[in-house]
């Protein structure tokens, strides 16, 4: 007679084993209709799974995040159901849930076209609209293998052979004549899967190994209702307009090419923004009392073996050899910073020692994962490492947190999600050390009034960490900042300091990044601002245009004055209509467009308008320069008169 305890503390007693769906029906028909799955004693279960003993139960509906994930997973199975009807020879590989959707990797000789995707989506909807029940069967490993062998599903057989123990009891989910295998849970009925859209097709190697066969990956998105789907698609449409790759080309900021995959060719205007970002962070480093250093691009393999990176990262490291020595191009800066710390005797009086670098790093990311500036192989990291005593950890972490928020607010990012990752099962150090480390991070966050979520067991083996994820104007999440405690690397690389009692002690190392990769952060900014950079960041802040040739000399004089004032300015003296020139520079997103005619030249003025078409009237050039200087010094996100 199981007693079921609900989230509100109420209890329901049953005379026999019950499913989540039974409990929902006992509460009311509305909840039974909405029930997707259950969380039984903290574990997600299918709505049909029987509960035989006393348990705590949360009923999952489409209003819950887990409910949305489950219906997305079931949409992947629905895709499999439809594709096997349209192309019966298809072999199904894997179909997991991803952010905002799902995908399925398939092996099909026929190369799918956009027309095929539309036909597939139509068939999926036709099937879903029949509202058929999804039937779950738990079977033996052998029965599961026999089922897929009879269907010629070689990838499912490979998963069973290579990933699932022979004494396991896999779950098979039957969508009418289509059968799939999954740990679940899944929706009990396809009425939950009416609001989806197939988005794109890509290539993907089986098991992510380039030596294996290239499969076709079909991406889709799925939501609980029509409104949520429409909102998401509208957001994607806006994101496409803001795509940094598209805007980067329009504004001539950078390019990438096949001969250097994942490496950026910065053009003048893009490099101007990059340098401005670097200058901004450098001012922050000075404000927060950091040393700035520069380590070598390559170091001997021996050092990477001592640091432990060779075991964990060697596949992602570019290597070269010379004179019978093997070198690795650095994927990160930390071992180099420990080498700098180790030069000369350090005392407790030297701590905390804050060491920062704009480190040029390289990682051999898979070519299929490269994506504009967001995922590259060569990048610049605004990396810093703080060497301190254990007693100094909380204060140093608190300072890092302040620096993160101080920096992000300058760019207009206010919605920041913070997560604290705690001790994993496999770790160095004793529980007392981890207790102190985790408590120091918690206290630093609380001291700054930061709300945070704890991710149990997600920390690195060498220490807990804080992750800062910013949300942009389209509510997309970008994990950029990190503060990571490290109790291992200083010891591995022999870093010590002389303590107050003259003993040799190992410092705690704090890894700290604010922007992360400057390339990636610049990509985020391009999309956040849609290329309409605030004045202080804009590669060209002012363009001055003449109406006739008579004003050409005065225009050049004005631009020379602005440049002397440190304002990035240019002139446009082309023999074109002024409307044409204004339109062209508006498309280039130049913040201020200055027009000079006879009257402006005579009065030593300029007619000022913004890229948004706002007419600010006539100003003396000294007055305009003063206003712009104030904007730049304040790093204002708005233009004049906004």
Curated annotation (Swiss-Prot):
Cofactor: binding comment: Binds 1 zinc ion per subunit.
Domain TGS: 1-61
Location relative to the cell: Cytoplasm
Molecular functions per Gene Ontology: ATP binding; metal ion binding; threonine-tRNA ligase activity; tRNA binding
Pfam family, one: HGTP_anticodon
SMART domains listed in its UniProt record: tRNA_SAD
Residues holding Zn(2+): 334, 385, 511
Names of required cofactors: Zn(2+)
Annotated catalysed reactions: tRNA(Thr) + L-threonine + ATP = L-threonyl-tRNA(Thr) + AMP + diphosphate + H(+)
Keyword Cytoplasm in annotation: yes
GO cellular component, one term: cytosol
Cited InterPro entries: aa-tRNA-synt_IIb (IPR002314), aa-tRNA-synth_II (IPR006195), aa-tRNA-synth_II/BPL/LPL (IPR045864), Anticodon-bd (IPR004154), Anticodon-bd_dom_sf (IPR036621), Beta-grasp_dom_sf (IPR012675), TGS (IPR004095), TGS-like (IPR012676)
Catalytic: annotated span: 243-534
Primary location: cytoplasm
EC number(s) recorded for this UniProt protein: 6.1.1.3
Oligomer and partners: Homodimer.
Role: Catalyzes the attachment of threonine to tRNA(Thr) in a two-step reaction: L-threonine is first activated by ATP to form Thr-AMP and then transferred to the acceptor end of tRNA(Thr). Also edits incorrectly charged L-seryl-tRNA(Thr).
Stated name of the protein: Threonine--tRNA ligase
């Amino acid at each position: 007679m199981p007693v079921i305890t609900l989230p509100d503390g109420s209890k329901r007693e049953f005379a026999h084993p019950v499913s989540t769906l039974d409990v929902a029906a006992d509460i009311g028909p509305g909840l039974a209709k909405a029930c997707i799955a259950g969380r039984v004693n903290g574990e997600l279960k299918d709505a049909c799974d029987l509960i035989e003993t006393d348990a705590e139960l949360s009923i999952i509906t489409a209003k819950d995040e887990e409910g949305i994930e489950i219906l997305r997973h079931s949409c992947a199975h629905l895709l499999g159901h439809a594709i096997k009807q349209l192309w019966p020879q298809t072999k199904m590989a894997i179909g997991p849930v991803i952010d905002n959707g799902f995908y399925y990797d398939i092996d099909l000789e026929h190369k799918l076209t956009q027309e095929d995707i539309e036909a597939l989506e139509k068939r999926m909807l036709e099937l879903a609209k029949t509202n058929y029940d999804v039937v779950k069967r738990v079977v033996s490993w052998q029965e599961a293998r026999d089922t897929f062998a009879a269907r010629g599903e070689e990838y499912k057989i490979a998963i069973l052979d290579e990933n699932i123990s022979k004494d396991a009891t896999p779950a098979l989910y039957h969508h009418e004549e289509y059968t799939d295998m999954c740990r679940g849970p899944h929706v009990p009925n396809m009425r939950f899967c009416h609001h989806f859209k197939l988005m794109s097709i890509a290539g993907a190697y089986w098991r992510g190994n380039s030596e294996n066969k290239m499969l076709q990956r079909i991406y889709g998105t799925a939501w609980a209702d029509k409104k949520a789907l429409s909102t998401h698609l509208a957001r994607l449409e806006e994101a496409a307009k803001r795509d940094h790759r598209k805007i980067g080309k329009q504004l001539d900021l950078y390019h990438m090419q096949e001969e250097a995959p994942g490496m950026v060719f910065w053009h003048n205007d893009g490099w101007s923004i990059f340098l401005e970002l670097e200058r901004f962070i450098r001012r922050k480093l000075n404000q927060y009392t950091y040393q700035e250093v520069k380590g070598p691009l390559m170091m001997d393999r021996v050092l990477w073996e001592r640091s432990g990176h060779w075991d964990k990262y060697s596949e992602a490291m570019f290597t070269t050899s010379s004179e019978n020595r093997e070198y690795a191009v650095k994927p990160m800066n930390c071992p180099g910073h420990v080498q700098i710390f180790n030069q000369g005797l350090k005392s407790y009086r030297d701590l905390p020692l804050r060491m920062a670098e704009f480190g040029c790093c390289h990682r051999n990311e898979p070519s299929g994962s490269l994506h504009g500036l967001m995922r590259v192989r060569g990048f610049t990291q605004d990396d810093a490492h703080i060497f301190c005593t254990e007693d100094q950890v909380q204060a140093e972490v608190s300072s890092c947190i302040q620096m993160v928020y101080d920096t992000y607010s300058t760019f207009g990012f206010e919605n920041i999600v913070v997560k604290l990752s705690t001790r994993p099962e496999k770790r160095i150090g004793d529980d007392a050390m981890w207790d102190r480390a985790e408590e120091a991070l918690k206290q630093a966050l609380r001291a700054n009034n930061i709300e945070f979520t704890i991710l149990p067991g997600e920390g690195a083996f060498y220490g807990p960490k804080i992750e800062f994820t910013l949300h942009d104007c389209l509510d997309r999440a970008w994990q950029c900042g990190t503060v990571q405690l490290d109790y291992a690397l200083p010891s591995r690389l022999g870093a010590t300091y002389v303590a107050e009692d003259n003993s040799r002690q190992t410092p705690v190392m704090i890894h700290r990044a604010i922007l992360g990769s400057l390339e990636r952060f610049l990509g985020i900014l391009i999309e956040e601002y849609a290329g309409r950079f605030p004045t202080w960041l804009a590669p060209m802040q002012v363009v001055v245009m003449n109406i006739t040739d008579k004003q050409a000399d005065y225009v050049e004089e004005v631009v020379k004055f602005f440049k002397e004032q440190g304002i990035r300015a240019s002139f446009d003296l082309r023999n074109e209509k002024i409307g044409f020139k204004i339109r062209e520079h508006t498309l280039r997103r130049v913040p201020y467009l200055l027009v000079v005619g006879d009257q402006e030249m005579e009065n030593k003025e300029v007619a000022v308008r913004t890229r948004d078409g706002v007419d600010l009237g006539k100003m003396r050039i000294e007055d305009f320069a003063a206003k712009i200087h104030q904007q730049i010094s304040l790093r204002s996100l708005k233009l004049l008169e906004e």
